[in-house]
């Protein structure tokens, strides 16, 4: 059975953001605006996405 994945794209800059939010973007594997990564849909990943919801776009 295939695991569910979620596509996350960074839409805003991390400059001037809280250090914890910048670290969360790094933890998600995002490096720059427009960068998209495909991650496993787990509760921990969802929590990280919720923390920086205003800087990312999510596609299921």
UniProtKB/Swiss-Prot annotation:
Q: Name the protein family.
A: Belongs to the universal ribosomal protein uL30 family.
Protein name as catalogued: Large ribosomal subunit protein uL30
Q: Cite the GO molecular-function annotations of the record.
A: structural constituent of ribosome
Q: Which CDD domains does the entry link to?
A: Ribosomal_L30
Matching InterPro entries, A to Z?
Ribo_uL30_ferredoxin-like_sf, Ribosomal_uL30_bac-type, Ribosomal_uL30_CS, Ribosomal_uL30_ferredoxin-like
Gene Ontology terms: cellular component = cytosolic large ribosomal subunit
Self-association state and partner proteins as the record states: Part of the 50S ribosomal subunit.
Q: Which GO terms describe its biological process?
A: translation
Q: What Pfam families does the annotation carry?
A: Ribosomal_L30
Q: Which PANTHER family match?
A: LARGE RIBOSOMAL SUBUNIT PROTEIN UL30M, MITOCHONDRIAL RIBOSOMAL PROTEIN L30
Q: What is the lineage of its organism?
A: Bacteria, Pseudomonadati, Pseudomonadota, Gammaproteobacteria, Alteromonadales
Is Ribosomal protein one of the keywords UniProt gives this record?
Answer: yes
- PROSITE patterns tied to this protein: RIBOSOMAL_L30
Question: Which UniProt keywords are given for this protein, alphabetically ordered?
Answer: Ribonucleoprotein, Ribosomal protein
Q: Which organism is it from?
A: Shewanella sp. (strain ANA-3)
């Amino acid at each position: 059975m295939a695991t569910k994945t979620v596509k996350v794209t960074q839409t805003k800059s991390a400059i001037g953001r809280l250090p914890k939010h910048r670290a969360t973007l790094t933890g998600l594997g995002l490096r720059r605006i427009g960068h998209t990564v495909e991650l496993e849909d787990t509760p921990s990943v969802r929590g990280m996405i919720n923390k920086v919801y205003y800087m990312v776009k999510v596609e299921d």
